Amino acid sequence: MERPRGAADGLLRWPLGLLLLLQLLPPAAVGQDRLDAPPPPAPPLLRWAGPVGVSWGLRAAAPGGPVPRAGRWRRGAPAEDQDCGRLPDFIAKLTNNTHQHVFDDLSGSVSLSWVGDSTGVILVLTTFQVPLVIVSFGQSKLYRSEDYGKNFKDITNLINNTFIRTEFGMAIGPENSGKVILTAEVSGGSRGGRVFRSSDFAKNFVQTDLPFHPLTQMMYSPQNSDYLLALSTENGLWVSKNFGEKWEEIHKAVCLAKWGPNNIIFFTTHVNGSCKADLGALELWRTSDLGKTFKTIGVKIYSFGLGGRFLFASVMADKDTTRRIHVSTDQGDTWSMAQLPSVGQEQFYSILAANDDMVFMHVDEPGDTGFGTIFTSDDRGIVYSKSLDRHLYTTTGGETDFTNVTSLRGVYITSTLSEDNSIQSMITFDQGGRWEHLQKPENSKCDATAKNKNECSLHIHASYSISQKLNVPMAPLSEPNAVGIVIAHGSVGDAISVMVPDVYISDDGGYSWAKMLEGPHYYTILDSGGIIVAIEHSNRPINVIKFSTDEGQCWQSYVFSQEPVYFTGLASEPGARSMNISIWGFTESFLTRQWVSYTIDFKDILERNCEENDYTTWLAHSTDPGDYKDGCILGYKEQFLRLRKSSVCQNGRDYVVAKQPSICPCSLEDFLCDFGYFRPENASECVEQPELKGHELEFCLYGKEEHLTTNGYRKIPGDRCQGGMNPAREVKDLKKKCTSNFLNPKKQNSKSSSVPIILAIVGLMLVTVVAGVLIVKKYVCGGRFLVHRYSVLQQHAEADGVEALDTASHAKSGYHDDSDEDLLE
């Protein structure tokens, strides 16, 4: 990967304990767009799709606080008045449900994946590798559990004791297909690669020799797990229709490929040299029949990706080194130019989040600044409004703290870079309409970064802090079925501090916070929020876990092992419905180290199933109970049935969040600022951008030039409000034609037939006509981005798929996207 720019180089200065971003002098690197949106949060009734796993190296945990103390205690300022009494007989109950497994294994790393949802099947792959002068020696072991990690069986013989390539991971099939693919190491002279396939939840494996050497992990079609996609080391695109038993190369010179809806495949191809050499001159193709026929849907492509129902492409502008985002909602048959600033060679785009209603887009600022601007789209993904200035995003390949709080709709948390280079956290409760600082926790004091010791706010540590090697073991955590709960490391002051953080919890989706635990911890949520488990982050061996049955108000300590272990990971089944937690680590003696896991089942702590009177009604987003609009966000309010903190009972695996929505009348809070307007900080009204005053707002929409008359507001995509305020907004057709030529697909290709000559002649005539129109209209509509004049393109260009537009990926566990820079190297 290319060398990160600016702040991503990791050089920091720390005056007054602030986390600051240092400006660097070396020239900036070329930007890489990141156009793949992170996958949406899981639905209330989890249907896990795709590999979800954890991977740890053989190492001790990073330095942390003291060894956890035993006993019970209460955090400050609890939300309910209660004593932290000791749970009856909890030590005996947990002791009877603690299962140790010692692995007779000296491997240097462990990878863990769940196979299916609620199946109890876990695969563990250990690897040991010693690099020699020319070749490397290694071995792998594969273990399987079918009781959530309480017991493991060595099944290495099922893969013929073959060394498995860990860079490909364990490719787990979608839904509960039970499919698993492991990619094996082969000798240098082999004609192709080798995989081991299982379709029965890893009970059996079949060895398959490939006619190619894979470059990437096998990609399952979301609609049919028998359909697989793979890129070869020679840039060939290969497809299998029978779960990898047989393969067919459907195209050569492919740079990037992705599955779209309905088994559509989108891919970019180079025509002159290589993927890197042709970056910005790639072609985007689509096949809807697994490679029988093809259609070129875009040219001059820099990168592309998928998010929600949108297909995005980063496209080079004519006679320029800038590029623009184009959007399609019909798999690339027609395209529209997004009303966003163009970016130069050293900048990037990044899709932070996308769903069927809207897109969060980060646009990098010119220069080596380490920040950019967040824009939010309309429901077409075309017209964008400025949402947040100075958004921290260090570089292509760098990190952003942008976090979707999945436990409450409309809530996102991220970081901004202040003028003094300090980093501050911001939160939005209305999907980017307004951002504000996080409230100071009631049971916390302002730290040394605060100018006023009585006025400060909470600042959240996320991906950027982790990338800078601060003492932050985990990113913020929330789960869709644990309504309102958010857990995160943070500091309380005027900006993020480099001092040792504490752990904070919110039970209302981020409106209010309380210190939950002192010092850094690992944490996870079980039983849809019924239990929270934590382990202190320490460089010493540990044997104590903490758990809470009342959303972090009171904590119990449990010694899970007489012999402390070097802790490496805390694992629970994705979806937060499980009652089991696995603690992974290793023990070491003078000459040896051994992997060990402890799986603890909390089923006897929550002995009874929850009943109706264990739940209480809770109005989400409630800030002013006396106001009839209280709780109205995005046009409606929601009342939830939530577990009482005092109830010690089990929600169960089949728990479904119960909620009752009701429509609200429209108010200013239901509107974003329209194109050309913005909301000043801490203001509710939109004001016109100074540089736009007196200018006519004209744009090109689907080939027609139109005039926009607006009072500065447009409804938030997905907002359901009815009646009430309705700011005037009118789009008038000026009866003038316009076009844009950034995307210009020239041909439709088929394996079975060539394009007739007569169609080529007709196409040439059409191109000539279009070129004439473009010359006439070049400065009227389209072309380079203007602040007060914007252009929308309709052309037969690209297909659905926006992954990895310009920026770097977030996380590497299946919840974030790959970047072009990763795939082009």
Curated annotation (Swiss-Prot):
Record PTM text: The N-terminal propeptide is cleaved by furin and possibly other homologous proteases. Phosphorylation at Ser-819 facilitates the interaction with GGA1.
Record motif Endocytosis signal, residues: 785-790
Family annotation (Gene3D superfamilies): 2.10.70.80, 3.30.60.270, YVTN repeat-like/Quinoprotein amine dehydrogenase
GO cellular component, one term: cytoplasmic vesicle membrane
Disulfide bonds: 84-554, 255-275, 446-456, 610-649, 632-664, 666-721, 673-686, 700-738
Keyword annotations from UniProtKB, A to Z: Cell membrane, Cleavage on pair of basic residues, Developmental protein, Differentiation, Disulfide bond, Endocytosis, Endoplasmic reticulum, Endosome, Glycoprotein, Golgi apparatus, Lipoprotein, Lysosome, Membrane, Nucleus, Osteogenesis, Palmitate, Phosphoprotein, Receptor, Repeat, Signal, Transmembrane, Transmembrane helix, Transport
Region Golgi to endosome transport and interactions with GGA1 and GGA2: start-end pairs: 777-825
Principal cellular location given in the protein's record: Golgi
Positions annotated with a glycan in the UniProt record: 96, 160, 272, 404, 580, 682
UniProt signal peptide: 1-31
Region (Intrachain binding of the propeptide and the extracellular domain): 48-59
Stretches of the chain found on the membrane's Cytoplasmic side: 776-825
Lipidated positions per record (S-palmitoyl cysteine): 781
Tissue note: Highly expressed in fat, brain, and lung. Expressed in neuronal bodies and dendrites of the piriform cortex and hippocampus. Also expressed in the islands of Calleja, medial and lateral septal nuclei, amygdaloid nuclei, thalamic nuclei, the supraoptic nucleus, the substantia nigra, the Purkinje layer of the cerebellar cortex and the cranial motor nerve nuclei of the brainstem.
Propeptide residue intervals: 32-73
TM helices/strands, residue ranges: 755-775
GO biological process: D-glucose import; endocytosis; endosome to lysosome transport; endosome transport via multivesicular body sorting pathway; extrinsic apoptotic signaling pathway via death domain receptors; G protein-coupled receptor signaling pathway; Golgi to endosome transport; Golgi to lysosome transport
Interactions with LRPAP1 and NGFB: annotated span: 610-754
GO molecular function, one term: enzyme binding
Domain notes: The N-terminal propeptide may facilitate precursor transport within the Golgi stack. Intrachain binding of the N-terminal propeptide and the extracellular domain may also inhibit premature ligand binding. The extracellular domain may be shed following protease cleavage in some cell types.
Complexes and interactors: Interacts with LPL and SLC2A4. Interacts with the cytosolic adapter proteins GGA1 and GGA2. Interacts with numerous ligands including the receptor-associated protein LRPAP1/RAP, GM2A and NTS. Forms a complex with NGFR which binds specifically to the precursor forms of NGFB (proNGFB) and BDNF (proBDNF). Interacts with the Trk receptors NTRK1, NTRK2 and NTRK3; may regulate their anterograde axonal transport and signaling. Interacts with CLN5. Interacts with PSAP.
Family (UniProt): Belongs to the VPS10-related sortilin family. SORT1 subfamily.
Its job: Functions as a sorting receptor in the Golgi compartment and as a clearance receptor on the cell surface. Required for protein transport from the Golgi apparatus to the lysosomes by a pathway that is independent of the mannose-6-phosphate receptor (M6PR). Lysosomal proteins bind specifically to the receptor in the Golgi apparatus and the resulting receptor-ligand complex is transported to an acidic prelysosomal compartment where the low pH mediates the dissociation of the complex.
Protein name per the record: Sortilin
Organism of this sequence: Rattus norvegicus (Rat)
